[in-house]
UniProtKB/Swiss-Prot annotation:
GO terms for cellular component: bacterial nucleoid. It holds the Pfam family RecO_N. It comes from Bacillus pumilus (strain SAFR-032). Gene3D superfamilies: Nucleic acid-binding proteins (2.40.50.140), Recombination protein O, C-terminal domain (1.20.1440.120). One of its GO terms (biological process) is double-strand break repair. The keyword Protease does not apply. The gene is recO. This is DNA repair protein RecO.
Length: 256
């Protein structure tokens, strides 16, 4: 059966001398793998539409296993991302997170829209750290491991200062700080943003200015939480961390 669907290229894997296996996140059919025959050839009509992060419409011959990609049409190439090594690192991490955090052939229009809006923002120059934070926070709910971000996990307090307890899965208020000696400190701004990221509609995001220290606090919480509960090992995470370290070094050189 032939199906036509909007999709985003999550990853490609070389298969034989000339073919590629392309993993797509589609709006209508969820995550699916397709064989793109001849896509490794530069003159192939499938080569251009099997580029990482590309958003397009795809005509697929479906089957019980791998489908076959018959043809496709690009809607947005996300070329700016692919031409920037730093943006590529961020986008690769986001797509691998969605790839590893979702099951095949289970439609989820919300996830599709989340990835599409995230890639668009990256492509248009929105702060990459903020985009990534939003995706990571929202993916916690998708994977069934959302922390408590609305109130203290112990007493239900909704106002005041909060830190984050990895052990207890969420915010703890200052009255309960003693219950977790290993809590991670959060400024009021970092706590507010973590809560906001869970509910925020990415399509409404404009330019955001967040202090480096606040970003560092949020990054620490998300890294520890994912390490503790997700069970995921993402190769792209290491690459992204290397790019972040390089960016800091380059920034330091510019300031000196």
């Amino acid at each position: 059966m032939l199906i036509k669907s909007e999709g985003i290229v999550l990853r490609t894997t070389d298969y034989g001398e000339t073919n590629k296996i392309v993993t797509l996140l589609t709006r209508e059919h969820g995550k699916i793998g397709v064989m793109a025959r001849g896509a490794k050839k530069s003159n192939s009509r499938l080569s251009a539409i099997s580029q990482p992060f590309l958003y397009g419409t795809f005509l697929i011959q479906s089957s019980t296993g791998l489908g076959t990609l018959q043809q496709g049409e690009m809607i947005e190439s996300m070329r700016t991302i692919r031409e920037d090594l730093f943006l590529t690192a961020y986008a690769a991490y986001m797509t691998e997170l969605l790839d590893k955090g979702t099951e095949e052939k289970k439609p989820n229009p919300y996830l599709f829209e989340l990835l599409l809006q995230s890639l668009r923002h990256l492509n248009e120059g929105t702060d990459a750290d903020i985009i990534l934070f939003i995706v990571e926070v929202k993916m916690l709910s998708v994977m069934g491991m959302k922390p408590e971000l609305d109130q203290c996990v112990h007493c239900g307090q909704k106002e005041g200062q909060f830190h984050f307890s990895i052990r207890d899965n969420g915010f703890i208020c200052q009255n309960c700080f003693s219950k977790d000696p290993y809590k991670l400190p959060l400024s009021p701004a970092a706590a507010r943003l973590l809560r906001l990221f869970h509910y925020f509609d990415l399509s409404r995001l404009g330019q955001v200015d967040v202090k480096p220290q606040t970003k560092q606090e949020i990054r620490q919480v998300l890294d520890h939480y994912y390490d503790e509960y997700s069970g995921l090992y993402l190769k792209s995470k290491k690459f992204m961390n290397q790019m972040e370290s390089m960016k800091k070094l380059m920034g330091g050189e510019n300031k000196s």
